[in-house]
Curated annotation (Swiss-Prot):
The gene is anon-37Cs. It comes from the Eukaryota. It is found in: Cytoplasm. Its main location: cytoplasm. InterPro entries: Amino_oxidase, FAD/NAD-bd_sf, Flavin_monoamine_oxidase. Keywords: Cytoplasm. This is Protein anon-37Cs. One of its GO terms (cellular component) is cytoplasm.
Length: 501
């Protein structure tokens, strides 16, 4: 891959020949590389990673079919105001593991990468600042809860198992216990409770759902915690995606190809049919469709219908919708915003007479300036109002968020934004959501069932995506590594067949 990054003028086929030229030759493996037809459904990070790994290893008859007119999936960078904004994934965990997103980013040459700088938000309650020492203490305690602190102990002793019904019950029970033992004054207890509530909403904003829907197993098997010092790409994470496809030609990466049917049996030849009437025969099919699409269309998309255990896994797993909102202003925002803000209490709900459609502002977690920008704000939203916010008219959303900003900084002259940019993952037919989570009716076994390949003699239908890996479940690391995992499964099949006959 490093060779490919350095020699951008080489075409894909020359590179592929070079990559396998020094490996031990086997006629059967060479024939497989030349003749095996592999169709990858979806050009998100799992699909691109799978195809790149197959092409790198000489499997030249690999094609990606992407329904939309763009590749990258939920890595989606938009130029907005004076900066680049991410509508999907933004942060890259610093992780030296093989096949991680960090490894891919590190190997992408000539790309500016920066570490997120510490930015302690100011918590605002009734127009006054919360003591930073209290905030730091509660933040530390909450991070322990996010790691499943005392969950195993509770299970062993059998005490208050009702609080383990879902993540929100667990958070509320443990935070109430902490507040009762750590803070004596009613004023401090109220402030602590509101800080905890803000952190609960932040946790929900990562998954894109109400925490009442999330299984406690999610935080014990797949901890959800934002990195303190992750990497980001100021010019957009989609630069990394561009690097992935630099050696693919138009025949190998085809956009505007929504798939209508996946015929995965009988052996040996399978096929993928597109809505435009085109048909692609395949020896192996790697399905990287988002979980939201599988939930809605798996029953009609696959022929024959998928086995019951896989259909149940698709049904049981939760699929949330993390929302991104960006606001662009004509003049520098530093004139009235001096740092990131986290509004609490009456700032979020100043009047009981608020109209119901304005309630979404109560779910605002943080308002912050986008790094490297002087004109763009990002609004972080928690809770379960994502679909409603996506459908809210621009003028209503701008009026409501401006009202909140004016209350936060006690300045009625805060201007209205010039432009608004927001994600629409839940209402996009090709995604129908943004991130998987463990629902209260599923377990880790559902992830394993979803990831299991189908096929009697060979892995004919394979599944990749961020919902198919417990390691990094729901993250871009899981998306990338799962694509490579399934590509390697195909490669290993032919290597073993050539070796053992």
């Amino acid at each position: 891959f490093k060779l490919a990054s350095r020699r951008r003028l080489y075409n894909a086929r020359v590179l592929q020949a070079d990559n396998i030229g020094d490996k031990q030759r086997n006629p059967d493996v060479d024939a497989a590389r030349q003749n095996t037809q592999i169709v990858v459904v979806g050009a998100g990070l799992p699909g691109l990673s799978a195809a790149q790994h197959l092409l790198y290893n000489g499997f030249r008859r690999t094609v990606i079919l992407e329904a939309t007119d763009r590749y990258g999936g939920r890595i989606n960078t938009q130029r907005f105001g004076d900066t680049y904004c991410e509508l999907g994934a933004k942060w890259v965990k610093i992780d030296g593991s093989q096949d991680s997103m960090y490894e891919l980013l590190r190997n992408t040459e000539g790309l500016d990468k920066q570490i997120k700088q510490p930015d302690r938000a100011t918590y605002l309650q009734d127009g006054s600042h919360i003591n930073p020492a209290m905030v730091e203490l509660i933040d530390t305690l909450f991070r322990q809860l996010c790691r499943g602190f005392k969950v195993s102990e509770r299970v062993k002793t059998g005490g208050d198992l009702h609080s383990l019904d879902n993540v929100m019950n667990y958070f509320r029970t443990e935070s109430d216990r902490i507040i009762g033992t750590s803070f004596q004054q009613p004023k401090d207890q109220l402030a602590a409770r509101e800080i905890f509530q803000s952190l609960f909403k932040e946790f929900g904003s990562i998954l894109g759902c109400c925490l009442e829907y999330v299984n406690i197993e999610h935080i014990t098997k797949c901890p959800v915690q934002q990195e303190l010092r992750p990497l980001y790409v100021p010019t957009g994470l989609d630069n990394v995606v561009d690097d992935l496809i630099q050696n693919m030609d138009k025949a190998q990466l085809q956009t505007g190809k929504p798939v209508g049917q996946i015929q995965w049996t009988p052996a040996p030849m399978k096929s993928v049919g597109c809505l435009d009437g085109s048909l692609y025969n395949a020896d192996h099919i790697i399905c990287t469709l988002p979980l939201g699409v599988l939930k809605s269309f798996a029953g009609v998309l696959f022929r024959p219908t998928l086995p019951l255990d896989k259909m149940l896994a698709i049904r049981n797993l939760g699929f949330g919708n993390p929302l991104k909102i960006y606001l662009s202003y004509k003049k520098p925002i530093g004139r009235w915003l001096k740092g990131s803000l986290r509004p609490l209490g009456t700032l979020l709900n100043p009047s009981a007479e608020q109209q119901p459609e304005r309630n979404w502002t109560q779910q605002v977690v943080e308002i912050s300036q986008v790094p490297s920008s002087q004109h763009v704000l990002e609004v972080h939203v928690g809770g379960g109002y994502y679909e409603e916010i996506e459908k809210l008219p621009d003028d209503e959303l701008l009026e409501q968020i401006t009202g909140l900003l004016r209350r936060c900084v006690s300045n009625n002259l805060v201007p209205y934004p010039q432009e608004l940019l927001r994600s629409n993952w839940s209402t996009s037919a090709c995604y129908l959501g943004g991130r998987p989570y463990f629902s209260t009716i599923n377990s880790a076994r559902d992830v394993q069932r979803l990831a299991a390949p189908l096929g009697e003699k060979s892995p004919g239908l394979l599944f990749a995506g961020d919902a198919t890996s417990l390691n990094g479940f729901g993250t871009i690391d899981a998306a990338r590594s799962s694509g490579i995992r399934e590509a390697q499964r195909i490669i290993d099949f032919y290597l073993k067949r050539a070796h053992f006959g």
